[in-house]
Amino acid sequence: MPVFALIDEPVFPSPHLAEPGGLLAVGGDLSVARLLAAYRRGIFPWYDDESPILWWSPDPRPILVPGHVRVSKRLERTIRSGKFTVTLDTDFAGVIRGCAAVPRDADNGTWIVPDMIEGYERLHAAGHAHSVEAWQNGELVGGAYGVAIGKAFFGESMFHRATDASKVAFVTLCRFLDRHEFRFIDCQQATGHLLRFGAVQVRRNEFLRRLEAAREEEGMVGKWVLPRTTRCASPQPTSESSPSAKQ
């Protein structure tokens, strides 16, 4: 299959035309319009600072139904202990930079390059990209971010600086998405971590079928907020050390 060079307009070729490894197109930009057009078709950017923007549509594709997330007894005890305060859309910039700081290969490189950070921050400002944060003693110690299109959520990356912080954040996000009837989380890559949480591999045709239905449902554009009763927390941090005071 050919790899398509994108034009100035925010349009994409059919994801069915991707190479066997999932690569579909090259070029373009990370404008809000182009990112939304990509995610609506199940396409996402993934590249490093030595390559142009690369756009992917893998086959198969790992997805997780939020209501089917598997949580071990030990992790459930940690969630209930109040060890972490969990919030949504409180420090998107901190989360995406925390994810970017995590080494992804033997060369300590990252695929979350500065242009990508800026692109997703614009998408967040437009109300389409969201973060979940785990706090401990007023410090950001873990989290994840992704993109919501209708009732589909596309998980991008997560990080942790304290044991179980990203896991608690992720489970809390899953339960929030389930409560709001999201159909699935696109995990993009099948890692052992996500498979243990209950992610399953589906073929591209099945993924796109699910996405076509989910994207037409009424979504949740704008800032997301967790009900206080689901924040997995002991008393909230004081105003001097609260997440909101850190921005």
UniProtKB/Swiss-Prot annotation:
Homology family: Belongs to the L/F-transferase family.
The protein's name: Leucyl/phenylalanyl-tRNA--protein transferase
Gene Ontology CC: one annotated term: cytoplasm
Reactions that this protein is recorded to catalyse: N-terminal L-lysyl-[protein] + L-leucyl-tRNA(Leu) = N-terminal L-leucyl-L-lysyl-[protein] + tRNA(Leu) + H(+); N-terminal L-arginyl-[protein] + L-leucyl-tRNA(Leu) = N-terminal L-leucyl-L-arginyl-[protein] + tRNA(Leu) + H(+); L-phenylalanyl-tRNA(Phe) + an N-terminal L-alpha-aminoacyl-[protein] = an N-terminal L-phenylalanyl-L-alpha-aminoacyl-[protein] + tRNA(Phe)
Record key words, sorted: Acyltransferase, Cytoplasm, Transferase
Organism: Solidesulfovibrio magneticus (strain ATCC 700980 / DSM 13731 / RS-1)
Keyword Acyltransferase applies: yes
InterPro entries noted in UniProt: Acyl_CoA_acyltransferase, Leu/Phe-tRNA_Trfase, Leu/Phe-tRNA_Trfase_C, Leu/Phe-tRNA_Trfase_N
Entry EC no(s): 2.3.2.6
Chief localisation class: cytoplasm
Any Pfam family the entry gives: Leu_Phe_trans
Function recorded in the entry: Functions in the N-end rule pathway of protein degradation where it conjugates Leu, Phe and, less efficiently, Met from aminoacyl-tRNAs to the N-termini of proteins containing an N-terminal arginine or lysine.
Subcellular location: Cytoplasm
Enzyme class, UniProt record, top EC level: transferase
GO biological process: protein catabolic process
GO molecular function terms listed in the Swiss-Prot or TrEMBL record: leucyl-tRNA--protein transferase activity
